[in-house]
């Protein structure tokens, strides 16, 4: 059995190369989760859930293929009629810590929908929110939704407690989704905080899953994997098992997302060397054949670009070779 740490689109693209019905557990990042109005949106969980059930829109790598956006478009139209400027409306501090705890520091106005949500996708967010209100944990709700969709992996949220990726920027404090989906990654980033991680707890399911061999896919190491690592005890658990990480870099170039800006804000070089510094518990890295970064850690080289299923299969096979290189822990 293999456990993946997943967030964003990097690890899901790698997962697309897994053999069908492989014995796989995925621990999903929830630092990107937000609440807009009455919708609890869990983007990184949803991407894996939709991928493993065969309904993911693989052109965008988010949302449901063939979805429509009538409700979203009309909400935006109404908001603009009321004078909305199109920017995210992150609620004030006193509103962030009132209501159900899972939405703490994740609350945005529901009347100003800066994130594009499809009509079918919206129904899953609505169902998730209703089940949470009925007293179920996020782990229980995720299991319920995966059962409905007949997913072929076991998907676990990193925690049932709220952890929010909060960025300090030149425009002020903002949630990661405001920075990325709202402001398109344009603000300058000064620091990143995983708010709530100091009190959030891992579940026993996550602890058990981290006893398996672990693969960290080529996801953003700061905001896709960082929230998972910020939880108490996670890095210690990873240091006790076999871990392979796939670099999201070819030299100083990353495949997608605001990795460079975010790694520099955390004080790391935005390249494979910086990644290795961020992941001291990793045993073997899978890096690109053309990556000229000087490396003093065990590695396997391959073409790490993932544009199709055969690419994903190639990178996954490189991960298996990486496990073969390790001594027993």
Language-model features and meaning:
Residues 196-198, 220-231:
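Active-site glycine- and acidic-residue-rich loops that bind
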Residues 18-21, 235-241, 279-280:
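Short, conserved loop/helix-junction motifs that constitute active-site signature segments
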Residues 29-193:
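Electropositive, gly/pro-rich neighborhoods at or near active sites that engage anionic ligands
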Residues 25-29, 242-249, 284-289:
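Short internal beta-strands
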Residues 255-329:
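C-terminal functional extensions of proteins
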Residues 1-3:
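Extreme N-terminal starter segment of soluble prokaryotic enzymes
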Residues 226-266:
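Redox- and metal-dependent alpha/beta enzyme cores, enriched for Fe-S-associated oxidoreductases
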Residues 139, 190-208:
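Active-site glycine-rich loop that binds ribose-phosphate moieties when present
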């Amino acid at each position: 059995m293999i456990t993946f740490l997943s967030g964003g689109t990097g690890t899901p693209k790698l997962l697309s190369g897994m053999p069908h019905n492989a014995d796989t557990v995925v621990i999903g990042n929830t630092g990107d989760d937000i609440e807009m109005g009455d919708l609890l949106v869990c983007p990184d969980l949803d991407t894996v859930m939709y991928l493993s059930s065969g309904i993911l829109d693989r052109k965008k790598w988010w949302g449901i293929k063939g979805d429509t956006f009538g409700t979203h478009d009309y909400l935006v139209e109404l908001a603009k009629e009321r004078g909305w400027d199109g920017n995210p409306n992150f609620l004030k501090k006193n509103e962030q810590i009132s209501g159900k705890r899972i939405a703490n520091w994740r609350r945005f106005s529901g009347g100003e929908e800066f994130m594009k949500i499809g009509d079918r996708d919206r129904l899953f967010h609505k169902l998730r929110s209703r089940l949470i209100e009925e007293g179920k944990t996020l782990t229980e709700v995720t299991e319920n939704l995966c059962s409905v969709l007949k997913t072929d992996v076991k998907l676990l949220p990193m925690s049932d407690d709220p952890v929010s990726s909060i960025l300090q920027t030149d425009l002020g404090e903002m949630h990661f989704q405001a920075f990325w989906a709202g402001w398109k990654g344009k603000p300058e980033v000064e620091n990143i905080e995983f708010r709530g991680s100091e009190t959030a707890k891992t579940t026993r399911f996550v602890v058990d899953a981290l006893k398996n061999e672990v693969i960290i896919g080529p996801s953003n190491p700061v905001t896709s994997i960082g929230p998972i690592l910020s939880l108490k005890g996670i890095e210690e658990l990873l240091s006790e098992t076999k871990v392979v990480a796939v670099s999201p870099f070819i030299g100083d170039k990353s495949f997608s997302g605001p990795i460079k800006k975010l790694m520099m804000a955390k004080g790391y070089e935005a390249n494979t060397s910086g990644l290795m510094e961020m992941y001291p518990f990793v045993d073997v890295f899978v890096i690109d054949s053309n990556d000229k970064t000087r490396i003093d850690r065990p590695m396997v080289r391959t073409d790490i670009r993932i544009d199709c299923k055969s690419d994903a299969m190639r990178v996954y096979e490189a991960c298996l070779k990486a496990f073969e290189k390790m001594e027993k822990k």
